[in-house]
Amino acid sequence: MSSEQKSQHCKPEEGVEAQEEALGLVGAQAPTTEEQEAAVSSSSPLVPGTLEEVPAAESAGPPQSPQGASALPTTISFTCWRQPNEGSSSQEEEGPSTSPDAESLFREALSNKVDELAHFLLRKYRAKELVTKAEMLERVIKNYKRCFPVIFGKASESLKMIFGIDVKEVDPASNTYTLVTCLGLSYDGLLGNNQIFPKTGLLIIVLGTIAMEGDSASEEEIWEELGVMGVYDGREHTVYGEPRKLLTQDWVQENYLEYRQVPGSNPARYEFLWGPRALAETSYVKVLEHVVRVNARVRIAYPSLREAALLEEEEGV
């Protein structure tokens, strides 16, 4: 099949004219120089894609436009496709020609919709409210209804990958969804009014790093892993706060981690282990499977560790 016979790009429901209007007005503005300079991009062996720092606060109320919703820590480049109708003419299959600039703007508009929807879902999570597909279409997706599967999938992936929040369908008939923390963990770090971003995703990464190292991971290994995400010892992070306090105090007090001196080390070195609450709520297998799902490279890099974890759980060790 030639490239001309492949699927067409999805467009807003109102057609080409509405698409052009959307490209100019519906959030397709390029980021400012300050926003680009403020973005912290990195890639992690545990978390695929490009991460960017999340601004400290969100705008109040439901997102109406990308200008009213700060960028989520994910940069997504994708194209939304739909299959041509059978029997359509070659010209219909090809669709209207678009310039590279229009293509780029349309992709950016879709990416902005992903950001909007992810923010909307985060608000639903904090409010402990269910959300329906109809509500998402009406309040966020709007003219991009044909692209809903892609936008919804990318937004859900972002929540799971970065914040450790899973979007689960609870009623297929009404397309109703609930948002819960991943892997059975009961912690999200939203303890005060100023806490707006769940921290479960970072906890899963730390637990995953420990699982990949065996029973424990040195402090150096943990900070090296977090460093590629832009999370550094002693440096305040927009989403996670002060990471050293989070790891060595908060999560230790919550019994998700143990932080102890390496026996016999002189000068003293420290290591992290799973705490009793982590062991009670989840397992090495679940954490490693989560890591594998968010980054297929882990399956290649750590196959023996994954097999060992599976065997360990089967034996009840």
UniProtKB/Swiss-Prot annotation:
GO terms for cellular component: nucleus. Gene3D superfamilies: MAGE homology domain, winged helix WH1 motif, MAGE homology domain, winged helix WH2 motif. Expressed in many tumors of several types, such as melanoma, head and neck squamous cell carcinoma, lung carcinoma and breast carcinoma, but not in normal tissues except for testes and placenta. SMART domains: MAGE (SM01373), MAGE_N (SM01392). InterPro entries: MAGE, MAGE_N, MAGE_WH1, MAGE_WH2, MHD_dom. GO terms for biological process: negative regulation of apoptotic process; negative regulation of transcription by RNA polymerase II; positive regulation of cell cycle. It comes from the Eukaryota. Residues 66-82 have a biased composition (Polar residues). Residues 1-102 are annotated as: Disordered. Residues 110-309 form the MAGE domain. Regulates cell proliferation through the inhibition of cell cycle arrest at the G1 phase. Also negatively regulates p53-mediated apoptosis. Keywords: Tumor antigen. PANTHER family: MELANOMA-ASSOCIATED ANTIGEN 4, MELANOMA-ASSOCIATED ANTIGEN MAGE ANTIGEN. Residues 1-14 have a biased composition (Basic and acidic residues). It comes from Homo sapiens. GO terms for molecular function: histone deacetylase binding. This is Melanoma-associated antigen 4.
